[in-house]
Amino acid sequence: MKIVLQRSQHASVSVDGKIVGQIERGLVALIGIGHEDTEATASALADKTAGLRIFSDDNGKMERNVIDAGGDVLAISQFTLLADCRKGRRPAFTDAAPPDRANELYEHYVSELRKTGLSVPCGIFAADMAVSLTNDGPVTIILEL
């Protein structure tokens, strides 16, 4: 499982021109799920997402997590994170989990985040989406298990 976290000032995700999820301050989580991933992987990464201290405290140090900062998490599935570009010029997506299994683990990740009290608006799984965000910092972190 690979997650790209981007600290954002505000972000939204749209499908067919309609906003389906948006946040103000918080994290945008782009989530790629592979064949070997399990509920335990999704739970561990949800815990890491919620607890990662990448928001500044009053002294300007990254000491606060998204919960402490009063932020939300915008969760967006993105199988292209599992692209294999080692051969040729066309990415291969054979490392990505099948859609049914990927959706189960995506929903598990979101559910685990929500158990922490976070608001977690989402994109629509497997839809073509337009993501808009203002990256804050910029701070972009890649989580992988």
UniProtKB/Swiss-Prot annotation:
Its main location: cytoplasm. It comes from the Bacteria. The keyword Disulfide bond does not apply. It is found in: Cytoplasm. It catalyses: glycyl-tRNA(Ala) + H2O = tRNA(Ala) + glycine + H(+); a D-aminoacyl-tRNA + H2O = a tRNA + a D-alpha-amino acid + H(+). The keyword Cytoplasm applies. One of its GO terms (cellular component) is cytoplasm. A motif (Gly-cisPro motif, important for rejection of L-amino acids) lies at residues 137-138. GO terms for molecular function: D-tyrosyl-tRNA(Tyr) deacylase activity; Gly-tRNA(Ala) deacylase activity; Ser(Gly)-tRNA(Ala) hydrolase activity; tRNA binding. Its EC number is 3.1.1.96. Keywords: Cytoplasm, Hydrolase, RNA-binding, tRNA-binding. A Gly-cisPro motif from one monomer fits into the active site of the other monomer to allow specific chiral rejection of L-amino acids. Homodimer. Belongs to the DTD family. This is D-aminoacyl-tRNA deacylase. It comes from Rhodopirellula baltica (strain DSM 10527 / NCIMB 13988 / SH1). The lineage of its organism: Bacteria, Pseudomonadati, Planctomycetota, Planctomycetia, Pirellulales.
